[in-house]
Swiss-Prot record:
Positions annotated to bind thiamine diphosphate: H76, G117, H118, S119, G149, A150, N177, Y284, E365
Biological process annotations from GO: 1-deoxy-D-xylulose 5-phosphate biosynthetic process; isopentenyl diphosphate biosynthetic process, methylerythritol 4-phosphate pathway; terpenoid biosynthetic process; thiamine biosynthetic process
Family of this protein: Belongs to the transketolase family. DXPS subfamily.
InterPro entries: Dxylulose-5-P_synthase, THDP-binding, Transketo_C/PFOR_II, Transketolase-like_Pyr-bd, Transketolase_BS, Transketolase_C, Transketolase_CS
Any one cellular-component term (Gene Ontology): cytosol
Names of the cofactor(s): Mg(2+); thiamine diphosphate
Name of the gene encoding the protein in the UniProt record: dxs
Protein's name according to its UniProt entry: 1-deoxy-D-xylulose-5-phosphate synthase
Enzyme Commission no: 2.2.1.7
Keywords: Isoprene biosynthesis, Magnesium, Metal-binding, Thiamine biosynthesis, Thiamine pyrophosphate, Transferase
Its job: Catalyzes the acyloin condensation reaction between C atoms 2 and 3 of pyruvate and glyceraldehyde 3-phosphate to yield 1-deoxy-D-xylulose-5-phosphate (DXP).
Pathway: Metabolic intermediate biosynthesis; 1-deoxy-D-xylulose 5-phosphate biosynthesis; 1-deoxy-D-xylulose 5-phosphate from D-glyceraldehyde 3-phosphate and pyruvate: step 1/1
Residues that hold Mg(2+) according to the record: D148, N177
Catalyzed reactions: D-glyceraldehyde 3-phosphate + pyruvate + H(+) = 1-deoxy-D-xylulose 5-phosphate + CO2
Protein's organism: Francisella tularensis subsp. holarctica (strain LVS)
Amino acid sequence: MSKYTILDKINTPSDLKLIPESQLKILSAELRAFLVDTLDVSGGHFASSLGATELTVALHYVYNAPYDNIVWDVGHQTYIHKILTGRKDKLVTIKKDGGISGFPKRSESEYDTFGVGHSSTSISAALGMAIADRLQGKSSNTVAVIGDGAITGGMAFEALNHAGGIKEDILVILNDNEMSISDNVGGLSAHFSKIISGGFYNSIREKGKEVLKNIPPIFEFVKKIETQTKGMFVPANFFEDLGFYYVGPIDGHDVTELVKTLRILKDHKGPKLLHVITKKGKGYTKAESDPIKFHHVAPSFHSGENITTKISKPTYSNIFGDWICQKAAKDKRLVGITPAMKEGSDLIRFSQLYPHRYFDVAIAEQHAVTFAGGLACQGLKPVVAIYSTFLQRAYDQVIHDIALQNLDVLYAVDRAGLVGADGATHDGSFDLAFMRCIPNHVIMTPSDENETYHMLEFGYEYNGPAMVRYPRGAGIGAEITGSLDLELGKAKIVKQGSKIAILNFGTLLPLAKQLAEKYHATVIDMRFVKPLDKIMLDKVSQTHEIILTLEENCIAGGAGSAVNEYFVAKDLSNKIIVRNFGLQDKFLNHGTKDLLLAQSKLCVENISKELDKLI
């Protein structure tokens, strides 16, 4: 007999609605157990979904998705949503080749109303949907679910301001699992929340307002008293000042209370914000104790089977983490900045050693960059540790606030290139293209750990904005040397060959070497995308017939395009054959990195096919 007596009956939200409300608590427990069992096989985002279990159940129990729009932010917390919307049996394939995505994806399910992966987008998207439905005469409801981390993003506040200003009928649910506000979740607060979310209170409140509006002094006095009283327990003032009807905070693990509150709010028109308190990792003791560690789990995390203790090579993030700590010890001007990526960027040790020089600005990439500019103006040396995919969000600041003023800011760009299982929303496919066109920038593409370390040093000492891009995961095991012969805009010949020259930008150097062995080709580690080594390009164009460029970046506008532009300007494009190899002009699905590289023709087999046609 299955241990999922209720869950086995559910494949869609319609099935869920047939379950008696009294059994929703049991269902929530079964969902957690199913999540543990499944991710023990597949791995995936864990703690966030555990924390949002009851909220997800309540939403699909009360609302009629997909007719009603439920919009999720980021997507880490949506595994329960996927289970309840026809993907229960596919969850074991999550983030695998040919499996379902780790994030909501419109092409995957009609219940995934908006594709996400980046933060703070839900309220904007939900507002657009609500207005579109209203303009087309559709009587649907729209809900945005956003976490206390994601709501720190400026885009979320822009959307709140817009929605509140136009009084659009939309519900924003703030899923708050931040422990620092736990003191607010007490008897008085819970009692007050029940009162203000009740239909009787709402009715009296609104009718009373209509009467008192005819007596302005009394109306303003009562409104002020109500706001101040609520403000003693909840952060109502801010949201109500934006035009939202605020309810909460309520217990996000009391599924009965959630269902009751959502039903009431469903009938309350206008912009509403429901503040729910949840615990990340709820129901799994280890995840509750260490939600960061259990944010994402590997297969066998629960059973302990097949877990090895082999020592792996340091990741590129580890190389950065070592460098910044060592540099900070020597230079008190160094300041480290991250937009909510302390763990991922390996800034934990730096934050502990230099807490007054470490700034986690939350999910605020635009602010992070301009903040760095302000620090640089006053003589400090800011280092912005940021993922390639998130650097996109600060593009205007990179141009207007840093490059235009030629400020000393170093961008340590992590997760450059393909990231594998997280898919297109997190791939760092575009940074070379969108950064290369900006004046005053130095752009470096290290080929291994040693070059990464020394290019970070070079970029830090450079007088102006500089960028070092490096991929996710471990390198080749290159030893960090005491020094490296590194000169601005100068490439390095790795292997001398003939006829064919391979210009490598970044960590595809092992691939370049494999091709060189097969074709007796010259291999050049270009190191710099900006400035390019033009002397080297002139030499190569005079001594070789075929030139290949390799990069883990989009071909359009990337490093290879920079080489093409130079050869065209020198009127050499008709005298040599140039072929660019990089990421294709399409978004890739999630999968193993080797598979995705092969799909992008970045492998010996595919490049050989092209070369054989040219020789």
